[in-house]
């Protein structure tokens, strides 16, 4: 049985999934991006399985090469966008930790509320 057309179609589907993931990352739709990751991983596994079953001809490898380049470029861009997001989250966590420390240090004043008074004299 000739699996070459099925392999080519699987690569096309992987390109589509890769482009979807890049769009989701660009639009900062992080939950949707994470949800789409499993379909992407499954598509990669299917390609690996099909590639083991057949030995793609040199011609087919040449046809698949541009798709592989596009997928790798998209993956690189998604990783860059994810790194930016992780840096943003790390900054927010750091700010939250500082705020918690300040509240802990100054918020527990033995039940007294420390506030400036208008009329001291």
From Swiss-Prot:
Location(s), subcellular: Cytoplasm, Cytosol
Region FliD binding: start-end pairs: 60-98
Presence of keyword Transcription: yes
The UniProt record lists the keyword Chaperone: yes
Parts forming coiled coils: none
Main location per the UniProt record: cytoplasm
UniProt keyword list: Bacterial flagellum biogenesis, Chaperone, Cytoplasm, Repressor, Transcription, Transcription regulation
Top-level taxon: Bacteria
Protein name listed in UniProt: Flagellar protein FliT
Lineage: Bacteria, Pseudomonadati, Pseudomonadota, Gammaproteobacteria, Enterobacterales
Family label: Belongs to the FliT family.
GO BP terms in the entry: bacterial-type flagellum organization; negative regulation of bacterial-type flagellum assembly; protein folding
Signal peptide positions (record): none
Gene name of the encoded protein: fliT
Subunit structure: Homodimer. Interacts with FliD and FlhC.
Region (Required for homodimerization): 1-50
A GO cellular component annotation in the UniProt record: cytosol
Function noted in UniProt: Dual-function protein that regulates the transcription of class 2 flagellar operons and that also acts as an export chaperone for the filament-capping protein FliD. As a transcriptional regulator, acts as an anti-FlhDC factor; it directly binds FlhC, thus inhibiting the binding of the FlhC/FlhD complex to class 2 promoters, resulting in decreased expression of class 2 flagellar operons. As a chaperone, effects FliD transition to the membrane by preventing its premature polymerization, and by directing it to the export apparatus.
């Amino acid at each position: 049985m000739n699996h070459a057309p099925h392999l080519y179609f699987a690569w096309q589907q992987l390109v589509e999934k890769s482009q979807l993931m890049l769009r989701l990352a660009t639009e900062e739709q992080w939950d949707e991006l994470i949800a789409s990751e499993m379909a992407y991983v499954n598509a990669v596994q299917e390609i690996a399985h099909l590639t083991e079953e057949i030995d793609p001809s040199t011609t087919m490898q040449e046809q698949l090469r541009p798709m592989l380049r596009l997928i790798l470029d998209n993956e690189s861009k998604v990783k860059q966008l994810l790194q930016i997001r992780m840096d943003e989250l790390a900054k927010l966590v750091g700010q939250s930790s500082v705020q918690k420390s300040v509240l802990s240090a100054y918020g527990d004043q033995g039940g007294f509320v420390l506030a400036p008074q208008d009329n001291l004299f």
